[in-house]
Amino acid sequence: MSSTDEKKFEGVVSEEPVLTASSSSDNGRAELGVSTNGEQPTVDPVFEKATLRKVDYWLVGFYSIVYIFRVIDSANYSNAAIINLEAGTGIKAELNLNASQWAWTLSIFSYSYLIFEPSNTLLLKIFRPSRWMFVLIFFWGAAACSSAAAQNFSGMMGARFAIGAAEAGFYPAVLYHMAFWYKPQELPNRIALFYSVGQLSSALSGLLAYAVSFMDGLQGISGWRWLFIIEGLPAIVLAFIALFWLPDYPETAYFLNDKERAFLASRLDKRAPASWGKSWDLEALKKLFSDPTFYTFSVYWIGHGIGGFGIGYALPTVIYQLGFTSTTNSQLMNIPPYVATFLFLNTLGYLLQRNIIRPWTTAVGIAVTIIICYIILFTVSNSVVKYIFLIVAVSCAGSAYPVIWPERMRALEGSVSSGVGIGFTNAMAQFSGIAGPRIYSTVFGPSYHVSYGICLIFLVVDIIALLLSWFFVHRKDKRVAALLEQ
């Protein structure tokens, strides 16, 4: 290979991971669970599986528990719209909110996400994951509890903005943190599990709202205020668990022995984020912003966020306006869509991990399915049929991002590019929180024909951006393969 080719090759192809602290020593390899049969080292699968299982418990397991309460916190604000509505003690009545003001209290949350989300991944690298996660989790728990004290529109706007600012960094920071521990091909089922637990907690939020509705008036406190207090307290407890027990990086993980730490630290691609990597690199950012996938993935995240995911911000109200349930039972009817999402997403994660299906074709299929659901919702009038296809649409919408995230992360290189790229990409999804409450405003109910029509347009944009991203990533893969052959 020429020196010119070598320079091109560096930045698009990773070197073989160094599997041992002493690569020249077969004994050293054996100690790290690596054998040398011929030229290519092979990893002991039993040792690797056991080591990764430990990481799964401490990293994926903990983050999944935290994500349950993070999603409950977000989802329950939509549930609060109809809690104790008939009793006259609902949140809109007590805070004197009109339709426009209610939409603003929903969307201000996403504005703070857009502002604070892109930088949070880098802050995690600067301050260490355990410390930064403590800050995020503690402050969103405290802000959630504080929102129960809101007395008017401006008070709730301030509380919601503070919650969004604290929660903004959590999801992209989790993905970024995982990239320090796992190979890209190991991420699909782990991201699917983590994300689907959050979707299941959206179902639990409906159950929690249903139960809390019976606390209305207890100690002179309205049901919706109890809801915000109860959902915020667990986050404060989990924040201290993160501070003292969340592992930062493979090299410093207290629950691993020396052999396991060395193995995990040496197995990743050189382009993957690393604990010793820079926290800021202007050249890496220039390369990131010149990559066409930075823009095509961003458009996809916006298109799917508004077209597919936006309905989630108004789902309790949409279900209530189907006309065959009371507000109390409507909380329970929010559960099936998210249970379906949990089952569907974990099934997809299982199939993706075993290469039975491919992420790109699966993501396109999801978008097409949502389009079909919206067309049916647009044309039929039967409430039961509408509810069934709402379940299908919500389960598909909630599964799209986790399916394509590993491909998005694979297209990023290095600690800085990965951090900024993950944060910025996920921030684009917050347009759903800005546009969703307005697209699904009650002024378009109960049919929501205008809402479904607008979302159809965004889903078409979603598919185009997805196909372009697929093209650019595939082109890069071909370039890598060609250089490998030289």
Describe these PLM feature segments.
Residues 131-145, 360-375:
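Structural signature of the two symmetry-related core transmembrane helices
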Residues 73, 95-96, 127-128, 149-155, ...:
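Helix-breaking motifs and short loop linkers at transmembrane-helix boundaries and internal kinks
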Residues 78-114:
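Extracellular/periplasmic helix-loop-helix junction of adjacent transmembrane segments
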Residues 1-79, 83, 99, 243-278, ...:
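Intracellular terminal tails of multi-pass secondary transporters
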Residues 188-221, 228-235, 422-436:
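Glycine-rich segments within core transmembrane alpha-helices of 12-TM secondary carriers
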Residues 114-154:
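Conserved MFS/SLC helix-loop-helix module at the cytosolic interface between two early adjacent transmembrane helices
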Residues 115-128, 343-358:
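Helix-to-loop junctions at the C-terminal end of transmembrane segments
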Residues 78, 283-349, 401, 405, ...:
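Extracytoplasmic gate region of multi-pass secondary transporters
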